[in-house]
């Protein structure tokens, strides 16, 4: 299905010279029952800028922006040691399935933006075609 206006959000961080030093992307995870769930991927920060909190600041900013858009849950797939710093917790696929087979199931993470506990969502979601490649999962 074609991408809708509110299906994709991109945020960037720039240095003092307006050069991009970090970026994040949130895209809609489409479930059969129309849940309002987004996927955070990828998160990228220029090597020179690692360890300065840019990725965390971008993620926090993006999560707040999605909250104002009525997004209820954000998922991501990665290192719990990093993503737990911005509120993500591990979740198993019995509660929310990933769009593709996970090579590292411990890296499937979720965050509620409503303050409510995350309840199970039925059905397998689809993601953007650009990341619907098993190599990323």
Question: How should these model regions be labeled?
Answer:
Residues 15-18, 48, 112-117:
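Short loop segments at secondary-structure junctions
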Residues 6, 17, 21, 46-54, ...:
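Non-catalytic interaction surface on structured domains
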Residues 40, 45, 51-64, 75-76:
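Conserved acetyl-CoA-binding loop-helix of GNAT-fold acetyltransferases
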Residues 29-40, 50:
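A conserved beta-turn-beta hairpin within the catalytic core of GNAT-like acetyltransferases
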């Amino acid at each position: 299905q074609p991408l809708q206006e509110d299906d994709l959000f991109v945020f960037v961080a720039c240095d003092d010279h307006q050069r991009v030093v970090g970026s994040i992307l949130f895209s809609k995870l489409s479930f059969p029952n129309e849940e309002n769930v987004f996927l955070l991927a990828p998160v990228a920060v220029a090597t020179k800028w690692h360890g300065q909190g840019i990725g965390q600041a971008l993620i926090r900013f993006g999560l707040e922006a999605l909250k104002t858009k009525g997004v209820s849950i954000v998922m991501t797939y990665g290192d719990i040691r990093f993503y737990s710093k911005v509120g993500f917790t591990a979740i198993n696929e019995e509660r929310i399935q990933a769009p593709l087979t996970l090579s590292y199931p411990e890296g499937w993470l979720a965050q509620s933006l409503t303050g409510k506990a995350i309840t199970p969502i039925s059905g397998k979601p689809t993601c953007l075609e650009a990341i619907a490649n098993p190599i990323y999962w």
